[in-house]
């Protein structure tokens, strides 16, 4: 039982949600959110430059924004918490409302966006729909330290999971992690910038296979490699 619970928690924790504008399968449009100041703060796009971004991250951001000009790539927005309409859609399709506590849900924040600027996960993702590629530009802050001076392996795994998961989701809809294998080649220096390059390799029914590598900005150092399997969720089946 404990093993089953742990697996379920790991899967839920690896959930990748859609960018703004993409709805869950079968969901109906809802009225726009009212403009409360707290909601505006929560829905502030965190994937744009802030003062904590170093020159490497800013330079890469500018380079990929240039690639977006012809429409081949697009930047994905990112927020501190899941927008209200997405929460309602997800609860409707995949969760038993009786098991959800509204107070806990109202306090929830996305793990990778729960740190103050510069202290944790600073990142932005770009997607190429034709090539089925997702690239994440990631700067790991001082609160992500593992071995002295280096980023914790779990933090690296988190960003790999988020990147390959978003790649699978953009290709096929709402997915959850079924398997993630990571080979760590070299430790990543704290507060440095890396590129996480992911690629959709194949699709078998509801199974999406995605691989990725983590490289230095100059692409001369390989830090990690990973393979993954994601399962597309069935709106007709609850997760609880």
From Swiss-Prot:
Q: Give the transit peptide, as a residue range.
A: 1-36
- Catalytic activity entry: hexadecanoyl-CoA + H2O = hexadecanoate + CoA + H(+); octanoyl-CoA + H2O = octanoate + CoA + H(+); decanoyl-CoA + H2O = decanoate + CoA + H(+); dodecanoyl-CoA + H2O = dodecanoate + CoA + H(+)
- Which residues are substrate-binding? 183, 185, 206-207
State the membrane topology: Peripheral membrane protein
Which GO terms are recorded in the biological process aspect for this UniProt protein? fatty acid metabolic process; negative regulation of phosphatidylinositol 3-kinase/protein kinase B signal transduction; regulation of mitochondrial membrane permeability involved in apoptotic process
* Superkingdom of origin organism: Eukaryota
Explain what the record says happens when changing residue 37 to A.
Abolishes cleavage of mitochondrial transit peptide
EC class, as a word, reads: hydrolase
Keyword Nucleotide-binding tagged: no
Q: Which PANTHER family match?
A: ACYL-COENZYME A THIOESTERASE THEM4
- Assigned protein family: Belongs to the THEM4/THEM5 thioesterase family.
Q: What is this protein called?
A: Acyl-coenzyme A thioesterase THEM4
Organism of this sequence: Homo sapiens
